[in-house]
Amino acid sequence: MIPELNYLKETGFLDVQAIYTAPGLHQVPEELEIQLQKQLEIAKKSAKKIIVVFGGKYCYINMRDSYRTIDTVIEEMREDGYYIARTEVENCLDMLATVDERKTLAEGQKVWFCTPGWLKYRDMVFKGWDKANANENFPQYTGGGIMLDTIGFFDDYAMEHIEEILDFSDWASIPLESRTVGLERLKDVLISAMAEEDRL
């Protein structure tokens, strides 16, 4: 969500200090936990109210302890005097479009959805993947790939990096296109995570 959150800061919707974990850590939950704890400690030095912009169900899966969730990690970081909340979504896709909205965009096809960050940071998101991993995962999406684009990222990125988009499509063996979705959903998700007295 780095491109989207930076855009909301640049356009004045967010007046926050944004601190990020590295992209793609849903594949490495131990590292995600370490980075999240570190970033929350940094955030607590400059803010009393903190929102963790992260999905719940699919973004942190601890194979060693299935009862340990992202919310468990966040709960352990709570202390008196701080408001810490997580965005109430299952994954990053839910921040940009609901399940029903994605079904509409898919038009009855089996589609792989992504956000701009998945393309921009693909080397980190798909770290350790080779063509065999891609062949195991992507061809099932017979409807191709759709990027949920809230900020015009895809067209701008294609102007300078068309080869990277084509390389990704070739590697994944599916075409990748974008669909414009508004920022309203993301704004609503962020507002819902705010302390009640701060909601617009």
What annotation goes with each model-predicted range?
Residues 1-12:
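N-terminal basic/disordered segments at the start of proteins
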Residues 102-166:
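A conserved mid-domain beta-alpha-beta active-site/ligand-binding segment of alpha/beta enzyme cores
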Residues 1-3, 25-30, 53-68, 91-93, ...:
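Gly/Ser/Thr-rich loops at beta-strand to alpha-helix junctions
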Residues 15-32, 178-182:
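A short beta-strand-loop structural module common to alpha/beta enzyme folds
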Residues 11-17, 45-46, 73-86, 164-179:
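Structural alpha-beta junctions
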Residues 29-43:
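Glycine-rich, highly charged phosphate/nucleotide-binding loops
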Residues 61-123:
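Long, charge-dense
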Residues 151-200:
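C-terminal, charge/polar-rich interaction regions
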